[in-house]
């Protein structure tokens, strides 16, 4: 019933804020609550989109390019440097396909300085991708005989900010450098998400908690010396207390939990805590240290986010599942379920052994059916996933504006 009001609200927000070029959001559906638990600004999941979703993705890519650089011919795509993962390569292949069909010449440049000549990367389907060394020419970045208007980054820069990407004032670098992990913080994102959720909840006359995971933040935590663990304890206790209060208010008979994870890394390491006393257990703390430092580069986390745990009651073939929504520009272009047979409803599903089941977001049959109980029919549920995914993307837009180091130059 609220669909016209929701879509108008988004339309007005996008008049004020620029969406990231692409985003994916991991959602958790607890039945009583539907919320994002992670928002990725360098999605590597385009291979999970079904062929039916591709026309949507191409249209969204066209819309994005028309706004950024309407006369664009060339697009330089910079993937992760460690590119042997076949799923990741398939995602890059799909991204190239989308932007090629949107009318661009797409070529791949690598930040790996050991690559001096164009180097083929074999694909599972027998094809190959060609990685080429970057060429920096004063204020512009390209490849040999290839000068792009836009540079699309699909590398979260967890190794640091490369000099070759800095001070590119004549081209569009998307997402911007401050979207990478050297500068980005999950806690800042969820601060922005809280702001967005409050505005949206006010529109619908609902409690923002139903779409927003509470969170706290700890800087400078050293698991080895236990310094800073007091901050973790305080935040765990405070968050659990607030969640207990909410569970009581809504008559939810669940034991709340929080997750502790690195604030400035994309890795899968998380620690689930149901009682602050668990942090007195040296074994649990050691597990937390290894979980939070099994982030992509294995570096010790010094900053942590403590986030309300949202259980997932989604199931695919009896395995626990969570929806992931994929967006280009301001449009939902598809989604999939991340499924893990060995994990519980309160555990991280982005772990080895997970599988992916595409969601048919597209197709006219998936428009919400007015008058049906919210969430009862699959289309209504998918629509809500798309709404929450877009709220996470809008929060990313707020976050990137708030953390833009050059913002004062544009005033």
Locate predicted features.
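Short glycine- and acidic-rich boundary segments immediately preceding or forming the N-terminal edge
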Residues: 1-17, 199-209
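Short, compositionally biased leader-like segments
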Residues: 1-4, 225-231, 290-296, 300
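C-terminal active-site "lid" helix and adjoining low-complexity regulatory extension at the edge
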Residues: 14, 42-76, 340-411
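Conserved metal-phosphate-binding beta-hairpin within the catalytic cores
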Residues: 17-46, 261, 309, 321-333, ...
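Short, flexible loop/turn elements at secondary-structure junctions
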Residues: 26-31, 41-43, 81, 133-135, ...
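Phosphate-binding site of ATP-dependent enzymes
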Residues: 28, 33, 238-245, 250-257, ...
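Conserved N-proximal alpha/beta basic substrate-recognition cap immediately N-terminal to
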Residues: 59-60, 83-255
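Glycine-rich phosphate-binding loop of ATP-grasp-fold ATP-dependent ligases
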Residues: 216-231, 257-285
């Amino acid at each position: 019933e609220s669909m016209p009001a929701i879509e108008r609200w988004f339309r007005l927000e996008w008049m004020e804020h620029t969406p990231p070029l692409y985003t994916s959001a991991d959602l958790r559906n607890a039945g009583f609550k539907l919320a994002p638990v992670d928002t990725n600004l360098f999605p590597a999941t385009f291979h999970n989109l079904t062929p039916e979703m591709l026309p949507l993705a191409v249209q969204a890519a066209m819309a994005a390019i028309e706004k950024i650089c309407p006369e664009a011919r060339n697009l330089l795509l910079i993937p992760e440097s460690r590119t042997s993962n076949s799923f990741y390569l398939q995602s890059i292949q799909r991204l190239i396909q989308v932007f090629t069909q949107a009318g661009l010449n797409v070529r791949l440049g690598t930040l790996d300085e050991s690559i001096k000549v164009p180097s083929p990367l074999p694909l599972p389907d027998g094809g190959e991708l060609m990685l080429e060394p970057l060429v920096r020419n004063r204020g512009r970045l390209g490849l040999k005989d290839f000068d792009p208007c836009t540079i699309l980054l699909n590398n979260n820069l967890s190794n640091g900010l490369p000099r070759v990407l800095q001070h590119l004032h004549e081209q569009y670098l998307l997402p911007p450098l401050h979207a990478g992990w050297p500068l980005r913080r999950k806690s800042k994102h969820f601060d922005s998400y809280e702001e967005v959720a409050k505005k949206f909840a006010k529109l619908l006359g609902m409690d923002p908690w139903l779409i927003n995971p509470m969170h706290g933040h700890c800087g400078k935590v050293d698991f080895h010396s236990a310094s800073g663990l007091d901050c973790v304890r305080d935040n765990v206790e405070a968050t659990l207390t607030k969640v207990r209060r909410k569970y009581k208010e809504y008559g939810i008979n669940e034991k709340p939990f929080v997750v502790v994870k690195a604030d400035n890394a994309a890795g899968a390491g998380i620690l689930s805590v149901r009682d602050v006393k668990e942090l007195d257990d040296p074994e649990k703390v050691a597990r937390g240290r290894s979980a939070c430092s099994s982030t992509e580069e294995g570096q010790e986390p010094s900053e942590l986010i403590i986030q309300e745990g949202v259980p997932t009651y989604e199931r695919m073939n009896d395995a626990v599942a969570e929806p992931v929504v994929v967006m280009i520009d301001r449009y939902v272009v598809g989604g999939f379920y991340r499924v893990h047979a060995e994990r519980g409803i309160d555990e991280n599903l982005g772990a080895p052994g997970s599988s992916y089941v595409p969601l048919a977001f597209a197709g006219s049959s998936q428009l919400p059916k007015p008058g049906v109980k919210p969430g009862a029919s699959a289309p209504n549920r998918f629509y809500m996933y798309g709404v929450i995914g877009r709220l996470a993307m809008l929060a990313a837009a707020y976050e990137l504006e708030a953390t833009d180091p050059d913002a004062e130059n544009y005033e």
